[in-house]
């Protein structure tokens, strides 16, 4: 039964998630602040690392559709779901975490940065928390490659918080929201 359930979830993530999320995105009023940082780095073909809390991962996904960013994603089943959704948004997943395959994933990101231009995304508190307590991977990658870290903040007028460890932020349809590059 578990296998059938997992196959259904993966089918949803592969086939249905993108159209549903794009429709959902159309209901949001999204304001982007400091987008000039990304434009500046991209115009110079310079590497950078986007960093945001695990709880805020949905809005950056919707905003960065088609931009080819490489996101660090766990090797667990939840990570497979996220990987399939990322691919549908023309984003890349580098699989690994602090508990499984992290060293290999880190080396992939580091090689990408050193061979640049390369754009990476991290949730420094993921995949298992604790919530809003950053692990050192993002800082280490930045210090070893010279790539600046661009923190992302997210806010919304109407939202729901999931009961998960990260208290995932689900922005309600027809909300006003802000994505802020620091």
What role is predicted for each listed range?
Residues 87-90, 112-113, 166-171:
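Short, hinge-like loop/turn segments at secondary-structure boundaries
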Residues 79-83, 104-113:
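Short, charged beta->alpha transition segments
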Residues 96, 123, 151-154:
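Generic beta-sheet signal
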Residues 135-182:
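A cross-family acyltransferase "interaction/gating" segment
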Residues 47-101, 145, 160-161:
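Catalytic core of membrane glycerolipid acyltransferases/transacylases, capturing the structured
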Residues 108-141, 145:
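Catalytic-site beta-strand/loop segments enriched in glycine and acidic/polar residues
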Residues 1-66, 110-111, 174-176:
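Membrane-anchoring hydrophobic helices of lipid-metabolizing enzymes
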């Amino acid at each position: 039964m578990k296998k059938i359930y997992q196959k259904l979830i993966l089918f949803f993530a592969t086939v249905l998630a993108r159209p549903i999320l794009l429709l959902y995105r159309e209901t949001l009023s999204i304001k982007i602040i400091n987008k000039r940082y990304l434009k500046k780095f991209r115009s110079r073909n310079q590497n950078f690392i986007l960093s945001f809390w695990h709880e805020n991962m949905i809005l950056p996904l919707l905003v960065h559709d088609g931009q080819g960013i490489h996101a660090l994603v766990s090797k667990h089943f939840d990570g497979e779901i996220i990987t399939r959704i990322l691919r549908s948004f023309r984003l890349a997943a580098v699989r690994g975490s602090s508990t499984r395959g992290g060293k290999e994933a880190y080396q992939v990101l580091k090689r990408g940065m050193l061979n640049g231009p390369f754009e990476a995304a991290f949730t420094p508190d993921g995949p298992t928390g604790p919530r809003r307590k950053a692990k050192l991977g993002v800082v280490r990658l930045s210090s070893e490659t010279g790539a600046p870290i661009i923190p992302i903040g997210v806010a919304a007028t109407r939202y729901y918080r999931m009961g998960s460890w990260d208290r995932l932020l689900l922005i309600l349809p027809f909300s006003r929201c802000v994505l802020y590059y620091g």
